[in-house]
């Protein structure tokens, strides 16, 4: 429900900007395109090759206590049921921390060796 509230507030802000009288001519199309470009960049999904397995990465925004966080998820459906999860203030940090969480869990479950885990944990 919080995501819907934030989306509603963003839409209301754009509508308000469009209908408020402006002292000069504004380029509304450029403004809306810029806002939508920034908002759509918050979500990200990708497929990666991880130690010979096809894995997925997903990042999505989340608001908690009026602060923007990025939740990351890393999983390999054809290999294991484990998932790496994270919540950070950094977009790139969320995917990196989710990958590290997955590597830690895979190491604990003896799916990978310590040497191969160290290569991913240092990077």
From Swiss-Prot:
Induction: By injection with lipopolysaccharide. Expression is highest at 3 hours post-injection, decreases to basal levels at 12 hours post-injection and is up-regulated again at 24 hours post-injection. In the presence of recombinant ALF, the expression is significantly down-regulated at 3 hours and 6 hours post-injection. It comes from Scylla serrata (Mud crab). It is found in: Secreted. This is Anti-lipopolysaccharide factor. Binds to bacterial LPS and may specifically inhibit the LPS-mediated activation of the hemolymph coagulation. It has a strong antibacterial effect especially on the growth of Gram-negative bacteria. Strong expression in hemocytes, heart and muscle, with weaker expression detected in gills and hepatopancreas. No expression detected in eyes. GO terms for cellular component: extracellular region. GO terms for biological process: defense response to bacterium. Residues 1-26 form the signal peptide. Disulfide bonds join 55-76. Keywords: Antibiotic, Antimicrobial, Disulfide bond, Secreted, Signal.
